[in-house]
Amino acid sequence: MRSLLLLSLLLLAPTASASALAQEKSAPKSFAQLTRGLQKLDGYFPLYYDAEQGKLLLEISRFDTEVLYQVSLPTGVGSNPLGLDRGQLGNGYVVRFERAGPKVLMVASNYRFRALTEDAAERRAVEESFARSVLWGFKVEASEGARVLVDATGFFLRDAHGVADRLRESNQGQYKLDESRSALYMPRTKAFPKNTEVEATLTFAGEGTPGALVRETVPAPQSVTVREHHSLVELPDNNYTPRRLDPRVGVFAVEFYDYASPFNEGLEKRWIVRHRLQKRDPSAAVSEPVKPIVYYVDGGTPEPIRSALVEGASWWADAFEAAGFRNAFQVKILPEGADPMDVRYNMINWVHRSTRGWAYGSSVTDPRTGEVIKGVVTLDSQRIRQDSLIGTGLVPVYGDARRGSGSTPECEFGASPDADYLAQLDPSADPARMSLARIRQLSAHETGHTLGLAHNFAASTYGRASVMDYPAPLVEIKDGRLDLSNAYAVGVGAYDKFAIRYAYTEFPRGADERAALDKLVDEGVRAGMLFISDDDARPAGAAHPLANLWDNGPDPVASLRHEMNVRRIALAQFGLGNVPRGTPLSMLESKFLPLYLHHRYQLQAAVKSVGGLYYTYAVKTDGGTSPADVQQIVPAARQREALAAVLDTLKVEELAVPPRVLALLPPRAFGYEGGTQELFAKRTSPAFDPITAATVSADLAVSALLEPNRAARLMQFHALDTSYPDFSEVLAELVTRTWRTPAPPSAPYHAAVQRAVQTLVVTRLMDLAADADASAQVRAVATAHLRALLEDTAPTSRDEATEMHRRATREEIERFLARPAEPRKRTPPPPAPPGDPIGAGRQTP
């Protein structure tokens, strides 16, 4: 019996030991156990880094407290079309951490729908009516009182910025995050009292053949490695007062639906986007701020560009002074060791790409109020090189009649000339000085966006009134020579001060802010502060004659004639003096392209008077409207003047590249086949193709005049008042200028250019006649003019080339007119707004 008992005890002992071990393993570990030996980063959300395991633990104690979660991209891919640039902001959310048993959920609030009321039940009704988004679920690893510890490694090692999606959408291939080649990036992982910053190196592995953009910029295109950044930031306190949007002033806004609004008022609320700025002395007309707005310029910017960025951005100090703040806006160089991704720093980043691209001004904004938390400017280093390219194409600084055709170049701007160099040159003929003037303006422009200001594309028509316009270089003609000394304005303009005053003026305590703002805006409107933004300037069929990109002057038509004169002078002197010694002559083409198309944007401005409409973003006031002029059709005489100026650009002598210049444009030199140069397309490769170049230039005018919306407006305005030109008149003038005006008989080359333009006109007419999106009346008029062109293509006794061209064109028109009809489908009428009081989009059962 004793032996049996002993045996039983021996058999049970291992089982008991294993059970105890299992209980020990399953027992939750404490904070101390999990964090022992780990690197702690104490801050807003404390972090614990396990270097051996490559893990990052996140301590959460701020439950049910809203924080800002912001994603960004510290390192880019380097291709402008991809849109994955260094310093780029990604998605931002207001989130809260919610404990749910063994999990912690990160939940994004939905501030697009809210109720501005003290009634908690009313607020809750709105919150529960619209979905929230759970961004992540964390497993609780340890809990101690009100704080928990979660393993956040997976959260931070994910593609939060959507890089793989962007690569796929850009047709660069299928990429997936490769965890084996991804890791936390601890040099940029930090914790501060009001924000916690985490960065990760992520590698995306490609499947199949990578796209061209990736192949051009990534050393091993199957492996795209970037870094993504995560910020958890304390939201601002409740001492900020939102300010309403006024459509007459171009300030961005956050828009939301307020379901606590009275039922007889609109749901939509719009609060402008701006930094918080308060006077130290509210009673003073001009006061120091409680806390200034400080921007930091990327230390990686070379001189003299760095100083130009500081100077240009600093112009905004004058606007804030006009709004009652002294020393409220400052620009500094980012201190050594400071993290540009830290939300405490408003940044002006200097970004490199393989090709030139847009600059951006964006902001981290509190979606609850519109308050700017961090401004982020992205400036492309290729932009200044493009400005230099334009300038050295206009002016032969590397040797001309004034300096001697073989003179040694003073500067190649890519070498970044210093101030001593700039002092030696005549500013009237110095592209480098012009380029730096442009980069100052660009710095001010993009910084203006981060201060809350939208584009104002009308400001160039009343005295260079805003850096928020897109300025073309103002090239003046003095004594028959081109003068670049006044190419770009210095400082912010009158409209900029007006907009900053609206956004930032602090009114005395007890003042009626709404009335004060209305007065401020009314005064600005009476002073001529016209604001017209992107949606009314960018479309090809835009109607407002004064809302234009890259234009100059109060009269777009006169400015077009001026730019054509500038182009003629520059073409007459274009040659060896436009490139430095030792440069292959084939490189001249990259400078010739912007010169040949120098007039393109001013042409786009002038053509808007044809079928054009002046209008404002007027609002109703006690006395009527402000501005008083709501809209007006462009006078008939003005429309015809603009049409004539636009058609003048189609003259053969304007389109034909001078033979002297053609002789200087050989095929690409050996070793220079690639690169970032932008060149004309060719049907004569490798030789330069002047006929295609002429077609490209002519199409600027032809396509603009045949734009379907412009054509429909012409017909509508003529129906209202027959004194206005109708679309048929415009087409008749276009056909007369291109088909019924003989080319100069001096050269077959000119006749070839004219034939190319004639073919273009017929092609664009056929495109319009077949455009299902164009109105039926517009298509009918286009078709009628195609029929009329059959007479212009009838056989004549002209030269053989002309006869072949006419015969081919006639046959092309006949084939088009006789084309088989497509299967008839019911043409839906333009959609009417929902009429049922219960809404639209779903049918009730």
Task: Name each model-derived stretch.
Residues 1-4:
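Positively charged n-region of N-terminal signal peptides that target proteins for export
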Residues 6-15:
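Bacterial N-terminal signal peptides
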Residues 23-301, 319, 333-430, 439, ...:
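Auxiliary tRNA-acceptor-end handling modules of aminoacyl-tRNA synthetases
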Residues 65, 300-328:
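Zn2+-dependent metallopeptidase catalytic core
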Residues 88, 299, 303-311, 433-442, ...:
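Soluble non-cytosolic domains of exported or imported proteins
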Residues 314-325, 353, 448-449, 453, ...:
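Sec-exported extracytoplasmic/periplasmic mature domains
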Residues 333-352, 437-492:
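The catalytic-center signature of Zn2+-dependent metalloproteases
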